[in-house]
């Protein structure tokens, strides 16, 4: 047995390349910046700028769909040129330079524009970065690699709202001052990817792809890949924007100062669970883990509807974070293993386009149900879609194993 194989079997927490750690730290810093803003943005839009819950849902859905559409082309371009890092750096750079727009924005239109451009940056970097993680990860360790990156990414999403809470207190609920501080970690992330991440050489024997989005190349993605996409799409319909968790907390009566605790709590559970879940997915049935994640999402939705007060809110948020930890890195690992190495960028781009459209629909449906029926209808609909995804997973479980 080789030393690398022995390490993989006995020490699943060690032996991942430095590049994966560096990419995780880049993601962490950018998420500190983004979540400092995102934790406050729904309330800032509704309280400060007079937007409705439906408007918040539309804004969030369009923003994420914009990112998803961009990922298709950046992922395909990374396959065509055989390079991932440069496109990822452009995406992080674009996100960094748009951050100052949030504190400077005088109207809702400016905030929406900043949010959309920020998501374009996310779209440009997303597929090439995920393909780069897959390229760097040792064979049989992709679940652990994606779990590590997801954990560090989510650690940033945990730190960001905590900073937002402290700064909202320090700045006497001045949203714009908090948004200015959020500019700093965004530019630190840009510097880190430029100088600390090294792309591996293209492996010998990997063919060059002239047009990754051609019909012939898309057919090479294979049936297992499209099965993963199908399951993830229905799953995404059940998992609308976390902005509605924030609005639910405000509805229950959580004070403005403590609103960022919603994302702090969710992301703490997400960060702690993502890496162990990734390691576990390298060692057991991934469909079983997906099914468990769907069950946790259903439980989270029901708790947020049925359990009273702050205790129910806290439990629902924790279950939501745990379902994210179990499923998000797992889906990324399934995509990496389902497709040829030379088409990974395209595969991630198509995956994110389709699930991004589903997220747009999910957020619009969630916002409409909230506005016209009530918050309970939003979470009950999410539980219903999660149950449908679980039913759809049953006939696909052998194909995904």
Please place each PLM-identified region on the residue numbering.
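Juxtamembrane intracellular "pre-TM" segments in multi-pass secondary transporters
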Residues: 2-17, 199-231
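Helix-loop boundary and gating motifs at the non-cytosolic
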Residues: 10-64, 225-262
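Transmembrane alpha-helix termini and helix-breaking/packing motifs in multi-pass membrane transporters
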Residues: 43-48, 159-177, 361-375
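Helix-to-loop junctions at the C-terminal end of transmembrane segments
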Residues: 70-82, 168, 273-285, 370-371
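Cytoplasmic membrane-interface "Motif A"-like loop-to-helix N-cap segments
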Residues: 80-92, 283-294
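C-terminal ends and interior cores of transmembrane alpha-helices
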Residues: 93-106, 295-308
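Cytoplasmic helix-loop-helix junction between adjacent transmembrane helices
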Residues: 114-155, 334
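C-terminal membrane-cytosol helix-exit motif in multi-pass small-molecule transporters
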Residues: 183-205, 389-397
